Amino acid sequence: MTLDEIAQKHGTDKSSLNHNYTAIYEPLLEPLRDKPITLLELGWGGHEDPDCGGNSARTWAEYFPHPGAEIIVVELESKNVQPDDDERITLWQGSQDDQGMIDQLAAVYGPFDVIIDDASHLSSKTIRSFELLFRHVSPGGIYVVEDTHASYHEHYYGSMEANENPEKRRRDGEFTMMQFFQRLTDEVNYRGRTELDLFPSRYAWNVPVESIAFYFNMLVAKRR
């Protein structure tokens, strides 16, 4: 089965019936399909119902059949892994921007071949998660941020005005997630300085970013 067929089977909104992220994921992940990868996803889904969610995790578990593959999920809400879920799925409760939890998670399961942020969609948490986790991506691995359209919605701490003018920050003085990743392209294309003119010094670290690709409502950062 294709990734999209598996996604439709499990009811995740990543399929072509909804966001159609599977069209982006398939060529990226197909070379890893039969390997013992470690995939970390932020966000179990299902909102506050403890027995709902996990559709994405089940999709990944079926798409990556290798017995050594691991699917790790971080979720803020209290959730229950269902009795018939694949035993290779592990669920951790915690906040995606909790450094202590992230450090513990990385120490146990890292490095990660694939990291997917499909959690809060709040710019501040999305940026912080990337700061904490990208260093734990395997060389050649990828870090995906889904639903980047949230950067343009006020209720997700976005700002149309800020995104239309990259020099203008949000009202709270911070960047939207799209502004952050747009600036990260400067790090990719202009290496050799510790701080770029348009790049906040607290984001200038020595983690080697190979590339950043922007798609409709989704971006992929690859590590060298």
Residue ranges and their predicted role:
Residues M1-I116, S120-V145, H149-R224:
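A short alpha-helical cap/connector motif
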